[in-house]
């Protein structure tokens, strides 16, 4: 069996990876959405800030304009005073001083620049010339209210600004009436907007000199603002460095009356901090969500992968037939797998127990039957032999496997080609079963016969895949078969030989007894004698018979009639062929005695005695047939069947035959050799 | 009857059969010049014996007839077998010789003799 690739276990990714991917897929859009929302809120905030800057700027400008309108209105009201028209300066001074209060002062300058009234100082102490000649010059060209830039007042000795209107007499500028104002008023105006903390509003004059600020008024009053700020486009929020060189969002606007610039700014660090905070928050969210998602995925992945790994290990153990233990899991599907594994183990255990029992029975049966088994794998050209087969072959475990050709090594060389051809034919022919018989040469040199029966297992296309067979040592059967065949051959021969003897008996009897009834009697007698000799031989499996038995059987009929017959001699075995011949001879002698000799009368006596003397080559038997008390004997006149048979039979036995027709009774001496009994 | 006067040599151990064969041959007009009941006896007699045809038993008192058959074949003498065994028992070199299966009739014997004797 091909070993499954170990790489498969490394293929694919852990369930935790998929869980992480799933979590990331789910949370990533959420995190992106949060990011987008955060970004949107930051940009919205930014937008709102910008809008707010614009609004604040507009409000400031409007406030400034309104303030100036009011101041101009005050000035215009004063300019219509009859006291001014009447040029009653002390009264006008008093009126003005009273009307303006402490935060502002009135300066009236004649067209030639000479100060007429200055309410900052007591009447009559006004400086000679104006401190704000620029406003006078402007008004001379265009008689309209003028808002001055910051200048240092001659009387206040501090930076101040003027709001001035022309006082006309006809088309001629007569006086310039100015309201002297301290920048603190502007600061108050700026601060009156109650800006959020960190916001800064500032005003600088047409020369780019700071007039008022919500913060650091004292420090920066009268200082010039950086040039890039003066060049800013109005009503546009830009990000640039402020007066302190810090990044800020800044917008500027110009008022209706003055060429002053109002500036509102707030530090970019605020915006940046918001952005940074949002980014920080977003990053923290990502880290937190991502971390917890991955952590949870790993955790869940472990609850998933751990029992899976346990199930995998259990499945491996199941495959190897080793024990395993698996715990219940919180996951239903894995419990189903575990259950399936336990069931499989249970079934396998039962199955393998049954299989073991079966195998045991089969092996016992095969051993009892002395069957050797073999299995030939056609594809790999490999034969596997069972231990019992190896026992039959007299081989050891080294021969447990072999190729097709090497498997034939045990076959007897004479049978090898036949067996090889037969086995090759088995693989190709359509039948699936086969039976062969051949000889094998065992390792110990013994030659044994085996029967090899088996079956070919094929694939669907009919190609042979395996051959499974059993081998049985049939040497004993084969030898028995051979013995039996020999026995049959021998039997066939003996029957034919006996028939030939019967034929000879018939032909010989016919020559001396041509009359049918006489022939029948004589032939039957001789057949009977032959039959009794055969019976004797059959008793000892045709190995032969004892001489005692041969003689007793030949004479049994006469002994039964009560004749005096004396039989006796040494114990000696006569071989089969000689037994028949000797029986027929004794039968002829007895027949003759019954007709003409001692057995024909009641007082006749017969003695058959013998000795058996062993010599180097064989045993010499010396048998004496002696008749007494019968009628007088005379030699036969013609050669009878009996005498011819005796002569030729003696020759057959290699015997010396002496016949003595003595008057007292026939004497017959027969000396013949029999083989010494085998060991 | 041209078998008349044919001189025959017999090797046969069974006395009765030997006698009967002898009678049959004489009935056919043959002359049995000699017979042997053992192989060694046959080989001894063959040295100086003059005859026309031999009738041989195959298993002679436990000894195979092979040396006798070989000797006769070597001399180019005609002979036939008379045996109770089948053809498979004949000497390998003489498997194709005429075989008279026991028991046989006189007519069988005559035909067998005719088939081995030169015409």
Residue ranges and their predicted role:
Chain B
Residues 35-53:
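Acidic, metal-coordinating helix/loop segments flanking the phosphotransfer/catalytic sites
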Residues 1-7, 40, 105-119:
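Non-catalytic signal-transmission and effector/linker regions of two-component phosphorelay proteins
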Residues 63-77:
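Short amphipathic alpha-helix used as the core "switch/output" element in two-component signaling
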Residues 80-82:
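Hydrophobic/aromatic residues positioned on beta-strands within the core alpha/beta folds
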Residues 57:
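Active-site residues of response regulator receiver
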Residues 102:
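A Lys-centered signature of the CheY-like receiver
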């Amino acid at each position: 069996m091909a070993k499954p690739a170990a790489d498969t276990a490394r293929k694919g990714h852990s369930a935790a990876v998929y869980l992480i991917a799933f979590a990331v897929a789910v949370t990533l859009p959420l995190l992106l959405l949060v990011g987008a929302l955060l970004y949107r809120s930051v940009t919205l905030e930014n937008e709102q800030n910008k809008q707010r800057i614009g609004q604040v700027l507009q409000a400031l400008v409007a406030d400034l304009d309104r303030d100036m309108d009011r101041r101009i209105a005050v000035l215009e009201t004063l300019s219509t005073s009859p006291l001014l028209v009447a040029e009653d300066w002390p009264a006008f001074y008093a009126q003005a001083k009273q009307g303006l209060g402490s935060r502002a002062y009135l300066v009236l300058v004649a067209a030639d620049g000479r100060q007429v009234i200055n309410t900052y100082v007591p009447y009559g102490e006004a400086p000679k010339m104006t401190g704000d000649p620029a406003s006078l010059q402007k008004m001379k060209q265009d008689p309209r209210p003028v808002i001055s830039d910051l200048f240092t007042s001659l009387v206040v000795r501090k930076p101040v600004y003027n709001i001035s209107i022309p006082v006309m007499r006809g088309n001629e500028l007569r006086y310039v009436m100015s309201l002297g104002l301290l920048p603190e008023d502007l600061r108050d105006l700026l601060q009156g907007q109650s800006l959020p903390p960190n916001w800064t509003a500032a005003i600088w004059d047409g020369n780019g000199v700071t007039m008022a600020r919500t913060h650091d008024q004292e420090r920066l009053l009268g200082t010039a603002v950086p040039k890039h700020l003066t060049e800013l486009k109005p009503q546009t929020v830009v990000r640039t460095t402020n007066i302190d060189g810090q990044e800020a969002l800044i917008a500027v606007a110009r008022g209706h009356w003055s060429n002053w610039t109002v500036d509102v700014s707030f530090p970019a660090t605020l915006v940046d901090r918001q952005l940074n905070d949002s980014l920080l928050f977003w990053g923290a969210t990502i880290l937190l969500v991502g971390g917890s998602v991955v952590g949870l995925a790993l955790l869940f992945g472990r609850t998933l992968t751990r029992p899976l790994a346990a199930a995998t290990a259990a499945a491996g153990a199941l495959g190897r037939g080793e024990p395993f233990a698996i715990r219940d899991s919180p996951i239903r599907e894995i419990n189903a797998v575990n259950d399936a594994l336990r069931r499989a183990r249970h079934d396998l255990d039962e199955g393998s127990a049954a299989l073991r029992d079966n195998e045991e029975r089969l092996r016992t049966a095969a051993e009892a039957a002395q069957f050797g088994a073999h299995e030939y794998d056609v594809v790999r050209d490999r034969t596997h032999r069972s231990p019992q087969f190896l026992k039959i072959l007299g081989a050891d475990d080294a021969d447990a496997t072999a190729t097709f050709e090497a498997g034939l090594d045990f076959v007897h060389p004479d049978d090898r080609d036949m067996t090889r051809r037969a086995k090759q034919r088995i693989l190709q022919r359509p039948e699936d079963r086969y039976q062969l018989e051949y000889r094998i040469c065992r390792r110990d040199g013994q030659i044994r016969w085996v029967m090899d029966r088996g079956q070919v297992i094929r694939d669907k296309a009919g190609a042979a895949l395996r051959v499974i067979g059993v081998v049985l040592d049939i040497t004993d059967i084969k030898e028995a078969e051979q013995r039996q065949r020999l026995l049959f051959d021998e039997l066939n021969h003996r029957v034919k030989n006996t028939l030939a003897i019967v034929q000879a008996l018939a032909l010989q009897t016919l020559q001396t007894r041509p009359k049918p009834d006489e022939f029948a009697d004589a032939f039957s007698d001789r057949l009977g004698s032959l039959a009794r000799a055969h019976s004797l031989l059959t008793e000892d499996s045709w190995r032969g018979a004892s001489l005692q038995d041969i003689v007793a059987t030949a004479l049994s009929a006469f002994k039964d009639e009560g004749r005096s017959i004396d039989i006796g001699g040494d114990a000696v075995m006569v071989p089969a062929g000689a037994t028949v011949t000797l029986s027929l001879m004794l039968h002829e002698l007895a027949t003759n005695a019954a007709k003409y000799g001692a057995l024909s009368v009641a007082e006749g006596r017969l003695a058959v005695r013998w000795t058996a003397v062993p010599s180097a080559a064989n045993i010499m038997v010396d048998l004496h047939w002696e008749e007494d008390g019968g009628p007088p004997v005379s030699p036969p006149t013609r050669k009878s069947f009996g005498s011819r048979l005796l002569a030729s039979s003696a020759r057959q036995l290699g015997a010396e035959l002496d016949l003595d027709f003595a008057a007292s009774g026939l004497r017959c001496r027969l000396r013949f050799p029999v083989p010494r009994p085998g060991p | 009857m041209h078998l008349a006067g044919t001189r025959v040599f017999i090797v046969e151990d069974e006395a009765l059969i030997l006698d009967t064969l002898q009678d049959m041959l004489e009935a056919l007009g043959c002359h049995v010049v000699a017979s042997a009941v053992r192989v060694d006896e046959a080989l001894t007699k063959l040295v100086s014996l003059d005859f026309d045809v031999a009738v041989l038993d195959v298993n002679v008192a436990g000894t195979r007839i092979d040396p006798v058959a070989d000797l006769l074949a070597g001399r180019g003498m005609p002979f036939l077998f008379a045996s109770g065994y089948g053809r498979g028992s004949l000497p390998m070199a003489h498997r194709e010789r005429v075989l008279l299966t026991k028991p046989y009739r006189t007519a069988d014997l005559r035909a067998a003799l005719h088939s081995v004797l030169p015409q």
